[in-house]
Amino acid sequence: MEEEVAALVIDNGSGMCKAGFAGDDAPRAVFPSIVGRPRHQGVMVGMGQKDSYVGDEAQSKRGILTLKYPIEHGIVTNWDDMEKIWHHTFYNELRVAPEEHPVLLTEAPLNPKQNREKMTQIMFETFNAPAFYVSIQAVLSLYASGRTTGIVLDSGDGVTHTVPIYEGFSLPHAILRIDLAGRDLTDYLVKILMERGYLFTTSAEREIVRDIKEKLCYVALDFEQELQTAAQSSQLEKSYELPDGQVITIGNERFRCPEALFQPSLLGLEAAGIHETTYNSIMKCDLDIRKDLYGNIVMSGGTTMYNGIADRMQKEITALAPSSMKVKIVSPPERKYSVWIGGSILASLSTFQQMWIAKSEYDESGPSIVHRKCF
């Protein structure tokens, strides 16, 4: 493989797709992982309506489209739509010919075996990639933070995982998954705003609520205390202007929404909160490495971007951990993109170049080669 050809790094999240070139410090393209199809028959002939739209274009025409997310809970469930997203990534966003660049894709922890095979097959057969590799998202986030040991709490739009990693290897028996992430918090905010009399029903209006969530929500250090403060004064209230000019006011919803991460029972889910899940994950690991994990709890993903989340996590885990244990929460400012950044670092390492699956190897062994080469 010649030096000058940059590898492509694509982090396919449930909510957003992050794509760019290895060696860059940030992704070139970040767009929603959505495919939209027209809800109505086009009436104006020659308008050039397409039968499907991807990413930002689907987002901007959302009023007339039905939006679908091909990745649910971090795992690809609709391969035809996924192919459209990859096609869009190569040809419209990065403007590259995929047959000229090695491709590094990311996958969710505990991704089913046949899924990695399918990804491998599509990259080699549909897009003719010269070389390919697939890497676990949480491991890449840890690389991006400059560590090889730690526990990653990765929470995006579709799924949350706690992944303990020791010397660069994830420990599958201790990985825990919670199907509670950004999308569920958006749904929950829709619900609690409804109690205030604000109705958001269409998929387009839910995107507005997502924006409200990202701009105004935060995690309370002490939830009960914060509720009292909110009830007694209006200092926590903020206003938000809707696209039609109407202004809405939001108060305790600001911290009630992300509180569901710590108390999933608010959503009617019988799951442990992110703090308890992180602790449970650590407890599934060998006694000897727990100290290293407590001292390196790394946050990653868009749903860890709330103000106050690291302090709250510190407080909750310190309460669960043995009293003498040093607990350290690492929350890098670029954690929204740390999976992608880790991929960019990995794919540009000189030692990594012999790790790629070459097209010739694929042609010889078929899709199952991915299990031998990528672990």
Curated annotation (Swiss-Prot):
Keyword match Hydrolase: yes
Main location class: cytoplasm
Alphabetic keyword roster: ATP-binding, Cytoplasm, Cytoskeleton, Hydrolase, Nucleotide-binding
Pfam families attached to this UniProt entry: Actin
Keyword Kinase: no
Cross-referenced CDD domains: ASKHA_NBD_actin
A GO MF label: hydrolase activity
SUPFAM superfamilies, per database record: Actin-like ATPase domain (SSF53067)
Compartments, record wording: Cytoplasm, Cytoskeleton
UniProt-listed PROSITE patterns: ACTINS_1, ACTINS_2, ACTINS_ACT_LIKE
GO cellular component annotations of the record: cytoplasm; cytoskeleton
Reactions it catalyzes: ATP + H2O = ADP + phosphate + H(+)
EC number: 3.6.4.-
Record's function text: Actins are highly conserved proteins that are involved in various types of cell motility and are ubiquitously expressed in all eukaryotic cells.
UniProt-listed PANTHER family: ACTIN
Name the record gives this protein: Actin
Organism: Cryptococcus neoformans var. grubii serotype A (strain H99 / ATCC 208821 / CBS 10515 / FGSC 9487)
